[in-house]
Amino acid sequence: MDASRCGDPIRVLLVEDHSGFRLVLRALLEADERLIVVGDVGSADEACAHPMLEHVDVALVDVGLPGTSGIEATKRLRELNPDLRVLIMSGSGFDRASDEALSAGADQYLEKGALHHDLIEAIVQAGERGRTTSAR
């Protein structure tokens, strides 16, 4: 079921330490009516403490966060919200970190240079899978 058809946009939390890139991502995602960005933060600690975390469908997390890595953030976020879908982003392509991210509970590993359509579709698909799983 398409979330936009039932009137409930997929709620996204952006976790990216580069504020300029975070603003661009937010604008890109908010341009799609199927998505709503409920927050954007620059660290794993901010993400884990976000007041809307229990209502987030998908977290889009940078692998290279300062302090706590995106991989460790994935583990913590999934512990705090087991229904959360986590998509890890990296600017360095697919490497050992992709395996680590998936092992940590990430649903998908994406390159930051991915076409915006591919990024949005990955978020929508992850959000819809999460809603299907949590409804059971």
Residue spans for each PLM region:
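Short amphipathic alpha-helix used as the core "switch/output" element in two-component signaling
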Residues: 71-83
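The short loop immediately C-terminal to the conserved phospho-acceptor aspartate in CheY-like receiver
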Residues: 63-64
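C-terminal output helix
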Residues: 96, 114-127, 131, 135
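Acidic catalytic/metal-coordinating carboxylates
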Residues: 43, 69-72
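Acidic, metal-coordinating helix/loop segments flanking the phosphotransfer/catalytic sites
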Residues: 40-58
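Conserved acidic carboxylate
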Residues: 16
